[in-house]
Amino acid sequence: MAVANLTTEQAILTEVRKQNRNRRALRLWLGFVLLALFCLVLVGGATRLTNSGLSITEWKPIHGVIPPLSAAEWDEEFRLYQRIPEFQQLNSAMTVDEFKGIFWWEWAHRLIARGIGVIFALPLIFFWLTGRIEKRLRWPLVGILALGGLQGFIGWWMVSSGLSVRTDVSQYRLATHLVMACLIFAGCMWIMRGLSPHSNDPAPARSSRGFAAAIAIFALFQIYLGALVAGLDAGFSYNTWPLMDGAVIPSDLLIQQPFWINAFENPKTVQFIHRIGAYTLFALTLINMVIALRAAPWTTHARRAVVLFSLVTLQAAIGIATLLMQVPLHWGLLHQAGALVVFGFAVANWRGFYGEYPHATAIAERD
């Protein structure tokens, strides 16, 4: 009986070690995907800030990988751009060489997006076929892949909004595109965090998990507001802080009718709401940190709360600097990068209250 029990335990320990190796491989893969997604969002931000998003007027998922290679091909691409309102109303004096400058941003954004599809799908198939993916994770990962495919359609849906009447893309579609990217990022972060070892530190309070969820969700909402700011060029509306052109609450926030449309289409109102959102997120993370430090000091939960508050504080400082300098490219990109870092850490912090995914066996590996 003792020999049988020992044999069983050794078999279980072998299975646990194998599962740990598989989890390390999956974490490495998802970490690389997260890095690629981070780069994609930054290039997308640069595409928006340089007004390059409408430079490619056709959607060619396969053939579009190859850029123009000859003068004739560049002339043809430029002729397509000359047909849209952005060129006719804003850039009619643009030359082919100047067009190339905006073309490459949009082309790079689309190329990276396609590349992410490959580096997600192919390893997913490999890990699935070789049995390295636990059953509980298979369909969530397939769901993320499906969201990636949907994101491609959303991207073209966004671009198409600026090809016929408008001289830019719809701020609503831009916000949808960015939020979807963040949801894909969050899904990868959630699973990767669940595959990572967790501490056994108790939560600071019963409400800690819910509070962490609220912070992550509000951070995503703040990113949505930031996308509206970018889509409306609202960062140029008020370039003073802490007051908005000398007022705490400007007088022209509700000038459009119906009044609720101001929250989405009035650049000044959108910037005002984004500022209020920043103050709210700062307050939420401050309260979260104070609760954690008082209730469970020296725990991983408290340390995460401190890091999260520090990241939000730094992001707020970057946002203020970007505003005061009237949104220079590098500072605008830094602010967008900071938003994704804050959101990613908020999601990881939220997932940290659930613990590591259970192992397939009930026997833990002993030293």
From Swiss-Prot:
<feature type="binding site" description="axial binding residue">
    <location>
        <position position="274"/>
    </location>
    <ligand>
        <name>heme</name>
    </ligand>
</feature>
<keyword id="KW-0812">Transmembrane</keyword>
<keyword id="KW-1003">Cell membrane</keyword>
<feature type="transmembrane region" description="Helical">
    <location>
        <begin position="305"/>
        <end position="325"/>
    </location>
</feature>
<feature type="transmembrane region" description="Helical">
    <location>
        <begin position="174"/>
        <end position="194"/>
    </location>
</feature>
<comment type="subunit">
    <text>Interacts with CtaB.</text>
</comment>
<dbReference type="GO" id="GO:0006784">
    <property type="term" value="P:heme A biosynthetic process"/>
</dbReference>
<dbReference type="InterPro" id="IPR003780">
    <property type="entry name" value="COX15/CtaA_fam"/>
</dbReference>
<feature type="transmembrane region" description="Helical">
    <location>
        <begin position="276"/>
        <end position="296"/>
    </location>
</feature>
<feature type="binding site" description="axial binding residue">
    <location>
        <position position="335"/>
    </location>
    <ligand>
        <name>heme</name>
    </ligand>
</feature>
<keyword id="KW-0472">Membrane</keyword>
<keyword id="KW-1133">Transmembrane helix</keyword>
<dbReference type="Pfam" id="PF02628">
    <property type="entry name" value="COX15-CtaA"/>
</dbReference>
<dbReference type="GO" id="GO:0005886">
    <property type="term" value="C:plasma membrane"/>
</dbReference>
<feature type="transmembrane region" description="Helical">
    <location>
        <begin position="327"/>
        <end position="347"/>
    </location>
</feature>
<dbReference type="GO" id="GO:0046872">
    <property type="term" value="F:metal ion binding"/>
</dbReference>
<comment type="function">
    <text>Catalyzes the conversion of heme O to heme A by two successive hydroxylations of the methyl group at C8. The first hydroxylation forms heme I, the second hydroxylation results in an unstable dihydroxymethyl group, which spontaneously dehydrates, resulting in the formyl group of heme A.</text>
</comment>
<feature type="transmembrane region" description="Helical">
    <location>
        <begin position="210"/>
        <end position="230"/>
    </location>
</feature>
<keyword id="KW-0560">Oxidoreductase</keyword>
<dbReference type="InterPro" id="IPR023754">
    <property type="entry name" value="HemeA_Synthase_type2"/>
</dbReference>
<keyword id="KW-0408">Iron</keyword>
<dbReference type="GO" id="GO:0016653">
    <property type="term" value="F:oxidoreductase activity, acting on NAD(P)H, heme protein as acceptor"/>
</dbReference>
<comment type="similarity">
    <text>Belongs to the COX15/CtaA family. Type 2 subfamily.</text>
</comment>
<feature type="transmembrane region" description="Helical">
    <location>
        <begin position="25"/>
        <end position="45"/>
    </location>
</feature>
<comment type="pathway">
    <text>Porphyrin-containing compound metabolism; heme A biosynthesis; heme A from heme O: step 1/1.</text>
</comment>
<keyword id="KW-0350">Heme biosynthesis</keyword>
<protein>
    <recommendedName>
        <fullName>Heme A synthase</fullName>
        <ecNumber>1.17.99.9</ecNumber>
    </recommendedName>
</protein>
<keyword id="KW-0479">Metal-binding</keyword>
<feature type="transmembrane region" description="Helical">
    <location>
        <begin position="111"/>
        <end position="131"/>
    </location>
</feature>
<feature type="transmembrane region" description="Helical">
    <location>
        <begin position="139"/>
        <end position="159"/>
    </location>
</feature>
